[in-house]
UniProtKB/Swiss-Prot annotation:
Identified in a complex with ZNF541, HDAC1 and HSPA2. Identified in a complex with ZNF541 and HDAC1. Identified in a complex with HDAC1, HDAC2, DNTTIP1 and ZNF541. Its main location: nucleus. GO terms for molecular function: identical protein binding. Residues 673-751 are annotated as: Disordered. Transmembrane segments: none annotated. This is BTB/POZ domain-containing protein KCTD19.
Amino acid sequence: MEESGMAHESAEDLFHFNVGGWHFSVPRSKLSQFPDSLLWKEASALTSSESQRLFIDRDGSTFRHVHYYLYTSKLSFSSCAELNLLYEQALGLQLMPLLQTLDNLKEGKHHLRVRPADLPVAERASLNYWRTWKCISKPSEFPIKSPAFTGLHDKAPLGLMDTPLLDTEEEVHYCFLPLDLVAKYPSLVTEDNLLWLAETVALIECECSEFRFIVNFLRSQKILLPDNFSNIDVLEAEVEILEIPALTEAVRWYRMNMGGCSPTTCSPLSPGKGARTASLESVKPLYTMALGLLVKYPDSALGQLRIESTLDGSRLYITGNGVLFQHVKNWLGTCRLPLTETISEVYELCAFLDKRDITYEPIKVALKTHLEPRTLAPMDVLNEWTAEITVYSPQQIIKVYVGSHWYATTLQTLLKYPELLSNPQRVYWITYGQTLLIHGDGQMFRHILNFLRLGKLFLPSEFKEWPLFCQEVEEYHIPSLSEALAQCEAYKSWTQEKESENEEAFSIRRLHVVTEGPGSLVEFSRDTKETTAYMPVDFEDCSDRTPWNKAKGNLVRSNQMDEAEQYTRPIQVSLCRNAKRAGNPSTYSHCRGLCTNPGHWGSHPESPPKKKCTTINLTQKSETKDPPATPMQKLISLVREWDMVNCKQWEFQPLTATRSSPLEEATLQLPLGSEAASQPSTSAAWKAHSTASEKDPGPQAGAGAGAKDKGPEPTFKPYLPPKRAGTLKDWSKQRTKERESPAPEQPLPEASEVDSLGVILKVTHPPVVGSDGFCMFFEDSIIYTTEMDNLRHTTPTASPQPQEVTFLSFSLSWEEMFYAQKCHCFLADIIMDSIRQKDPKAITAKVVSLANRLWTLHISPKQFVVDLLAITGFKDDRHTQERLYSWVELTLPFARKYGRCMDLLIQRGLSRSVSYSILGKYLQED
C-alpha cells in the first residue's frame, strides 16, 4: 500500500539530489519526517519556480543506504560493510534518527533488514528512462518510487554510452584509456570495441569487469588481484585475446604461484598466442579510428559534419550538430574527434578517404569544404561576435573518469591536495575545468576521493584489495594519503597477516610518509553547466565525537543569479576532529595542479604549442618524406572527384609558435614561399641591423636594436617581459598575499584624461583559459586600446571577487588568445620603445597615430605596415613588409576580440589590478 501511494507522488512533490554522480528522488512526504535534517531544510527552501536539484559532494554509493532509510526508516543488510562511512554521512546531514539507529546497531538493539534486490538501480534501470532524463537534462517525469530503488548513478553505459552510442538493453562494461597507453598497446582498441575518442582518451567496451586488472598491469607492470580471487579463468581468457606477451606471462605466473596450477600442468604458450609484442604492432592513425567510429552511425545521428583545425592547419578535428555529438558533449564537455596531428597526416587522410566508398561521403564533403580557399576573417570582427566570460568558482562540479568508473565532485575537493592535479602521469583534462581523466583503478579511486573529501580513509570492513590499493596510493604521490594508509588499523592487520604467511617483504607496504594533518571540507554546490542547476548546501562544523543529539547545523544558500554568473560562496567547515593542514593557505594557492600539462607540447611543458612551419606548395615537390615526396597536384587529383573546383588555390597557412627554452619569448612564424617569418615581438626586430646581430645568421638575424642611447624610462614601465604562458602547476608559486590582497598600481583614469590617441593597460587577473578546454592559461595581459572611456561609462555589475574565482574562460580558443596577446604586445612595444629610445616626438607621434588608425580600422594592415616601415630606423624591404603584413593581418582580429573580453573582465570587477599609461602625455610639448 505504501508503494502504491508513492506511485501517485507528482514530480512537483519530489526533491532531487545528486550525490557524487548518483541521482536520487525523495517524496516531500518522506523527507518532511526528518525536519531537523539539512536535506529537508535546504530542499524545503526551494521555490516551485526553481526546480533545482541539490548537489552533495559525498559518496553516492553510501548514500543509497541513506536514501533507503528515508523511505523505510530501516537499515539495509548491505549497509553493514560501510557503517563508518554511513555514520559520517548521517552526521553531516544531521539525520538524528539514523544516527540513533546506528548507535543501536552497535549495541545490538537494531536488526538489519534484508532487501530483495540490494543492487544499484543503475545496473538494471530501463534505458528508456535514462535516455529521456539525459536528453532533457532534468529529472525524469517518472522517477522510480520504491524503497528498493537505491539511486540512479549516471554511469556509462547507462549514461554515457546508451543510444545513440550503444543500442542495447544489456549492461556493457567500459573503460577509459589514455591515448599514450593505446599507442603503447594498440591491441587494446579495435574497430569493434571503440566507443569514443577524444584528444587524450579512448573509451572502449570491455568483455568483462575483470578488464580493469589488465589495464592496471599495463600501467604498473604488476598483477594485483583481490584476496581469494576466483575469476582467474575469465581474466586469462581476456588476456589471451589481447596477445600481449608480458601480460600473458604475468597471469600464468600468478596462477602458478597461487596454487591454481603447477609449472608441470600449465601448458606452454602456443606459437600463435602472445608471439608478437605490442611494439611491433602498427599504431593506427587517429583518423582511421575516428572515421571508422562515425560511419557506424546513420547520418541522422551525425547531423551536419564539419572539420575544424588549429591555425597552422596541422591538427584536424571533426564534429557535427547531430544528437550523437550533442550527447557526448553533455558528458565529456567536448565532442571533437581528433583526426591528424601533423601536416603529413593531412595528405594521408585525403588518400585514405579517396579509397573509401559512399559511406564516407559526408566526411569527404566536410573535408572538401574545409580545404576550399578561404580568406582571413574581416578586421571588423566585433560586429558579429560577442565577448563572453565564464567564471569557474571552487564549487564548479567536475566529472572525473577513472578506468571503468566515473564520479562527480567539486573543484575545491580536487584542489585540497594539489599533488593530485600536479601529477601529469595520472591526470589528464578531457575538457578543462569540466571533465577530468585519471589513469588509475576506478574502484580504488572511490576510496581516494572519499579521502579528498573527508581528510581520512573510510574503507569497507571486508576490504580485500590491499595490494592494488597500496599501489594506487603510492602512485598518487599525496603524502597525507600515504600517512593515512600507514595509520589505518585494517592495513596494519593485513600487513601483519601477510608477514606471518610469507617472510618476503611486499614492496607495496613501504610507503613514503610525510606527517601532515588532513583537512576536511564538505560542500553542496550548484552545477553551473547543467540546465537543471544545483543549489549549494554547506555542513556546519561538528566533531567525530560530538553526540548525535548535540550536533547542530545551518544551511547557507547563494542568491539566484543569471546563468552566466552562477557561482557559490563556500563556508568551509571541519567535520573531523583533525585540524586543517598547517600552512594550508586559501584554496586559490592550491591551483598549481589544476592545469597539469599532459605533455602536448614536447619537452617544454610550459611552452606554447610547437608546430612545424611547413608550407604546402602546389607546384613543388617535397624534398623530405614528410610530407610525401609527390607533387601536391597529384594529391589534389585524388580528391578531384569530390568536386573541388579551385584546387589550384588550395594551400595551408601555417602559423607557428616555437621556443628554444621555456623562459624565452615565443617566436611566431608565418609562411612566405618556403620561408618562415619571425614574430614581431619587439619593435627592435624590425629596425635596422646592428653590427653585432649580423654575426648570427639565424631566423632572428635582423633583430638587432637601433644604435641609439636609451633615455629615461617612461612613467609607465610597460609590462613586456619574456612572459611565458603558464600551466596550472605554476599557480601555487604565486604569493598568497598577492592573491588575497591585490592592490592596483594605479587607478583607472577618468574619461576626461583619456585622449583619442590610446591607452596601454597592464591587467592582472585570475587565470584565463580558452573556450576549447586547452590546459594553458594567462594571468596578466598587456592591452592596447582606444576605448577606455567605455569602462568608465559602464557601471560594474555584481560579480564574485577575484579571491572567489578559480579561473575564467574567454570565448576564444587558447591559440587565438596566444596570438592576440602577441599582437597587443607588439603594438604597445613599438610605441613604448620609441618613447624609451627618446625618438623625436614627431616620430613617436607617427607611431602612435599608426597604431591608433590600425586599431580603429581607419587604415588596412597593409598600409599600416608600409607606413610603419617607412619610418626612419625600421627595416624597409619587401621581404620584411610581406612577413609583417601577414602577421598583423592574421593576429589583429584576435587582438580586438581579446581586448573586448578584457574590457568585460574589468567591467565585471574580475581583475586583480589595472594600471595604465596614457600615450598622449608623451607627445605634449615640454
